[in-house]
Amino acid sequence: MTLSAPSDALVIAGKPYRSRLLTGTGKFKDLDETRLATEAAAAQIVTVAIRRVNIGQDPNAPSLLDVLPPDRYTLLPNTAGCYTAEDAVRTCRLARELLDGHNLTKLEVLGDERTLYPDVVQTLKAAEQLVADGFEVMVYTSDDPILAKRLEEIGCVAVMPLAAPIGSGLGIQNKYNLLEIIENAKVPIIVDAGVGTASDAAIAMELGCDGVLMNTAIAGARDPILMASAMRKAIEAGREAFLAGRIPRKRYASASSPVDGVIG
């Protein structure tokens, strides 16, 4: 299983997690596939779009909680589909009511339907309101290092910069900005959006990200269960490579075999 060692836990809002792979619950063909993919990913935190997924809003419809029970998983309600701070705050309050006072939430305030980029002004506004209201906010944002630091200073418990547009599968487009965010952060930095395959996830972890959240890369794969397993292994490999420390890049060769005692 892709689980960090106990001494290398991902800590969010004071709670340790062994898995650094966070998964979404949308786009799967049914709830059973959602469950199987989540298990294959060994995810402990799963995000839920409150405006799109039933977690009790409709008592007559199948509920995600039937396959991903809160006593086994940390549910991370998100505000996907919100375009204003007001809508996002209202959605978070609804989620807290449905989940019996659960305060951990993923804030998304989108700027437009074509790019699904975050509206940074509305995101800042919503983050301030939610933190003041007692929420533990994990926030989706652009890869702007200044904005990421500002969201941390507001009190967000994790900052989640995009690697590329949501659902694009383009992979990490700006390593420099991500490194700037990581090096200056005192809260977990979790790549959110844009991952397409296992190598993208590994690169994010090799850069020093604390985790990766993904949905489309798994749910949209030809074999979602197998891809979830691949992502789990990639996260583990990338994290171990980061901790091990890569060798520096050089322009010239460096022999790997010792030269002492060479014949001739």
Curated annotation (Swiss-Prot):
E.C. designation(s): 2.8.1.10
Family as reported in the entry's similarity comment: Belongs to the ThiG family.
Name the UniProt record assigns to this protein: Thiazole synthase
Catalytic activity reported: [ThiS sulfur-carrier protein]-C-terminal-Gly-aminoethanethioate + 2-iminoacetate + 1-deoxy-D-xylulose 5-phosphate = [ThiS sulfur-carrier protein]-C-terminal Gly-Gly + 2-[(2R,5Z)-2-carboxy-4-methylthiazol-5(2H)-ylidene]ethyl phosphate + 2 H2O + H(+)
Keyword terms: Cytoplasm, Schiff base, Thiamine biosynthesis, Transferase
Any GO BP: thiamine diphosphate biosynthetic process
Subunit structure: Homotetramer. Forms heterodimers with either ThiH or ThiS.
Gene: thiG
Molecular function terms from GO: thiazole synthase activity
GO CC terms of this entry: 2-iminoacetate synthase complex; cytoplasm
Main location: cytoplasm
The UniProt record lists the keyword DNA repair: no
Pathway: Cofactor biosynthesis; thiamine diphosphate biosynthesis
Protein role: Catalyzes the rearrangement of 1-deoxy-D-xylulose 5-phosphate (DXP) to produce the thiazole phosphate moiety of thiamine. Sulfur is provided by the thiocarboxylate moiety of the carrier protein ThiS. In vitro, sulfur can be provided by H(2)S.
Pfam families: ThiG
PANTHER family: THIAZOLE SYNTHASE (PTHR34266:SF2)
Location(s), subcellular: Cytoplasm
Binding positions for 1-deoxy-D-xylulose 5-phosphate per the UniProt entry: G167, A193, G194, N215, T216
The keyword Transferase is assigned to this record: yes
Active site: residue positions: K106 (schiff-base intermediate with dxp)
